[in-house]
Amino acid sequence: MNKFSLFFALTATLMTITESAVPTASISAHVLDISGGSPAGGVQILAYIQQNDDWTKIGSEFTQDNGRVDWVSPDFTLIPGTYRLVYITEPYYKAKNVESFYPYVEVVFNIRDATQHYHVPLTLSPWGYSTYRGS
């Protein structure tokens, strides 16, 4: 096997491993700061599932520079239920020396089919936010 063939074989293997790291049954998130038209890197996202009358923490991740978290609960297998993502926004704006109204944003949603991928984006400004189920 020549050097180029070996390089391409290793690259293909690495890409396959990387692509399969996040399962289909997962929750991802994306935070966009619409006040500046940019991704919001460094925002902590806490993930919870409701069990009986309590919330059990299943993950804690920070958005990357591109504002994304590929998998908010990598150590938890999704099951049908009610979930909550808490986007901790105050430190993000404090680091920018910007006053904000919301110290955090909670998004509560139901998962009925735990085999699907769920994407929960948040568009954010110091004075408001919006969220939706993405793809």
Swiss-Prot record:
It catalyses: 5-hydroxyisourate + H2O = 5-hydroxy-2-oxo-4-ureido-2,5-dihydro-1H-imidazole-5-carboxylate + H(+). Substrate binds at residues 30, 68, 132. GO terms for biological process: purine nucleobase metabolic process. The keyword Hydrolase applies. Residues 1-20 form the signal peptide. The keyword Nuclease does not apply. Its EC number is 3.5.2.17. Keywords: Hydrolase, Purine metabolism, Signal. HIU hydrolysis also occurs spontaneously, but more slowly. NCBIfam families: hdxy_isourate (TIGR02962). This is Probable 5-hydroxyisourate hydrolase R09H10.3. It comes from Caenorhabditis elegans.
